[in-house]
Amino acid sequence: MRHVYVGNFDYDTRHSDLERLFSKFGRVKRVDMKSGYAFVYFEDERDAEDAIRRTDNTTFGYGRRKLSVEWAKDFQGERGKPRDGKAVSNQRPTKTLFVINFDPIRTRERDMERHFEPYGKVLNVRMRRNFAFVQFATQEDATKALDSTHNSKLLDKVVSVEYALREAGEREDRYAGSRRRRSPSPVYRRRPSPDYTRRRSPEYDRYKGPAPYERRKSPDYGRRSSDYGRARARSPGYDRSRSPIQRARG
């Protein structure tokens, strides 16, 4: 059985995505995913060679990133699962563990907590789409859990456990939290009220208020009334023009 190294895929790439891709070239025994890279184990060495030749430097995933596929070197294999079956990591030990390869649909935070709490006090479990962070109270508990749970089964899935990069995990959470808390306030609370009062009230006063209506109507109505009054003023003249004739005939 030979295994190949796969790198440069999207961070949210799933275990099933890689298994589906490389199963096209032969029987895949297992896929061991790490943080940013993976090892794909083929039953036949010729299938592994064919997969390297046809997938290296090809685009993959939603981000259309170019894969890096090559034969796995001995030191790369030791970072995953050595012959004695224990986990080996060249990362600095932290209190937080990085967990992948679990079932993202069936696995809940409580399932993850039950899986790790026999090895120490679990302070926090943060689950994402297809990976999780498990934070322990002490460094000793985290190391004990890493040695005991790497390549263990969680809901019928063999999970991979490593030390988390503390800086990357904390920055992600702080950025996501601040973005959720602060983005609604300037858009919803600050903008609508001043725009509404400044834009609508002057137009309403200029076009719908009672003052312009009275200024437009009253002069016209007054002029028409004065003309009517002048028309009625001719009646005395009419009476005066007819009265001499009527007097003469009389």
Curated annotation (Swiss-Prot):
GO terms for molecular function: RNA binding. Residues 2-74, 95-166 form the RRM domain. GO terms for cellular component: nuclear speck; spliceosomal complex. The modification Phosphoserine is found at S183, S185, S201, S218, S243. Its main location: nucleus. It comes from the Eukaryota. It is found in: Nucleus speckle; Nucleus, Nucleoplasm. Residues 192-230 have a biased composition (Basic and acidic residues). SMART domains: RRM. PANTHER family: SERINE/ARGININE RICH SPLICING FACTOR. Probably involved in intron recognition and spliceosome assembly. Belongs to the splicing factor SR family. RS subfamily. This is Serine/arginine-rich splicing factor RS31A. It comes from Arabidopsis thaliana (Mouse-ear cress). The gene is RS31A.
